Amino acid sequence: NKKIQIAAYWITIFKKLKEGVLYIENAEKFYLATNTNSYRIARNCKVQTIRVPFLVVHYSWARSEEELNQKISNWGHNKDFDIDKYLNFWKNINKTNYKEFSNIHPFIKNAWKKLNYCEGKTIDEVIKNLIHKDISVSKSNLIINNIIQFIKYKFK
């Protein structure tokens, strides 16, 4: 039985606003499923990864100020950045100024390159409106990465 893991891409909803959301413009790879239980870091099992072109809406950061403070204060990476400074940064981002910011991730440079805005008061409205945005996963990138993974793990 060959061990594999499946990776998809999420659209991180960064902040909920009155009439919509701010989201991270670039879709980010995450591990979705596996047939093994040998997790290492961030659900990565260090086995062959098959990337699929699925987008998942991830509301991880779209919380109240109190909830976000609790999240990042208890996060395993809470020593990797200044929590108070980042929370203040998050609080001050809004619909009129979000385009002024880049490299949004608290400690991984270029992971979250920039924000974009999507209208929608409910999750259903946000998803419906995100479908019309130009968010996609490069097919050539998927193919190349899947071929590399196949070759890498074929001879292990």
Enumerate the predicted regions with their spans.
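Catalytic-site signature of metal-activated, phosphate-bearing donor transferases
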Residues: 1-156
